[in-house]
């Protein structure tokens, strides 16, 4: 996985919009790369400049210096590179300089380095010797400890091939990862 055209918009707000290249030659990876790049373009098009809005400067909660960003969708990547597996973490959300950080959503895509294909949750469970009962117990424990409802989950492998579970939860007021 590599990136081009970084398109750094704001250093202070850590906003950049790179083009991702998965460098895996199968339809699944090509389709994912195309989808992610389209989403990145859409996020970049969401930028609203501070000079285009009328706000009280005292409402700004971020240190932005002289940068001219009021709000924007963000879209970021992180790679978890293990011996046999490669997981792409995609984080996205919306930033507004007059509000504390909003919800950030996460998606994970785990590839087998041997085959180049995305792994399903079933394949990930098998690799990590994780059962459906293990997942049910983890969900129940998390929901009970945090007084939330897990709306959905996604399994992925970290760089050490440990099975991890990304959860989308609802606490009765907001939904978040």
Regions found by a protein language model. Give the residues of each.
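Compositionally biased intrinsically disordered regions enriched in Thr/Gly
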Residues: 1-177
């Amino acid at each position: 996985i590599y990136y081009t055209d970084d398109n750094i918009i704001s250093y202070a707000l850590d906003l950049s919009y790179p083009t991702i290249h998965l460098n895996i030659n199968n339809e699944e990876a090509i389709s994912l790369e195309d989808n992610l790049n389209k989403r990145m373009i859409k996020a970049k098009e969401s930028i609203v400049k501070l000079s285009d809005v009328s706000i009280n400067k005292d409402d700004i909660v971020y240190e932005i210096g002289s940068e001219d960003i009021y709000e924007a969708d963000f879209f970021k990547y992180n790679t978890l590179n293990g011996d046999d597996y490669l997981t792409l973490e995609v984080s996205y959300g919306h930033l507004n300089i007059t509000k504390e950080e909003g919800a950030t959503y996460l998606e994970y895509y785990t590839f087998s380095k041997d085959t180049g294909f995305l792994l399903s949750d079933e394949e990930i469970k098998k690799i990590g010797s994780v059962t459906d009962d293990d997942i049910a117990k983890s969900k129940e424990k998390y929901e009970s400890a945090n007084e939330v409802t897990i709306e959905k989950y996604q399994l992925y492998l970290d760089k050490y091939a440990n099975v991890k579970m990304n959860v989308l939860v609802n606490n009765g007021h907001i939904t978040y990862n």
